[in-house]
Amino acid sequence: VKVMPVDHDAYGACGLLIETPEMKIAYSGDLRLHGYREKDTLNFCKESKNCDVLLIEGVSVSFKEYDDELEEVETINENELIEKINNIVKSNIEKQITFNYYISNIERILNIIKTNPRTVVLSAYNSYVIKEAIGVETYYYQLDDKDYGLNKNLKIDFEELLNDENKYFWQLDELALKYINKLKKGGVYIHTDATPLGDFDPNFKPFVKNFEDNDIKFNIVKCTGHARPLDLIKIINLISPKLLVPIHSYRPEKLYNENGDILLPKKGQII
């Protein structure tokens, strides 16, 4: 079994290449071509070329058609997402600005920290995750009593964040959200692929309304961690498997294999 990194919005995502005496099987895991690690996905395609079986995710075709345009809140790639977030911050001078993000997207938050015009402050837990994953220390606030082993010189008092309107760009996680009624009126919040993810989640509309009720502008800026429909076909064609097995999709039948056969597996089926 060969483990290979691929481009995804979760740090450390990998595909697998499984070689047996009888066949060569590639498993994509979750992957894409529009993130920070496009070359890794292309390398996975190269290594998996002409495999006997390709098991590939099909998340995007669950919800989108091949000719669908990007949603207004969706960016072409991660770099555009960072630029869009920074522009929101720059255009809201003297306003409190908070955000939340997908905790596994280490590379995104690192680039936000590096480029944002304000000092970025994370929750203690998220700061701990980044430190453990890649050894980078960040500014943080803490609302629980756990010992994460963080640098106390980087700790920002939560009351200071609640009163801030120009210095900080800080994470509003689930614990901090309990204090939403203490946030500044007329402030700004940026939701970047954090939970709840969207309208399909029954918690999403009440979540958005909570900000509206507290006079905080709600912004969505997102960039999917999954290959878009046409990119999925590009990946399949680059690999050119003898047998394609779509998985991780509500509509696996939307994928097709121009160079071989396709199998739509059923629950409990042994291939």
Task: Identify the residue ranges that each predicted region occupies.
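His/Asp/Glu-rich metal-coordinating catalytic cores
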Residues: 1-107, 111-114, 121
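Non-globular, low-confidence helical/coil segments that flank catalytic cores
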Residues: 2, 27, 35, 128, ...
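Conserved beta-strand termini and adjacent loop/short-helix elements that scaffold enzyme active sites
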Residues: 4-6, 123, 141-143, 221, ...
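Active-site metal-binding loops of divalent metal-dependent hydrolases
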Residues: 7-9, 29-31, 58-59, 102, ...
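Flexible loop/turn segments at secondary-structure boundaries
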Residues: 10, 34, 62-65, 105-109, ...
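Short connector loops at secondary-structure junctions
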Residues: 58-65, 124-135, 139, 222-231
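Hard-cation-handling environments
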Residues: 68-179, 183, 247
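C-terminal regulatory/interaction regions
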Residues: 114-118, 145-271
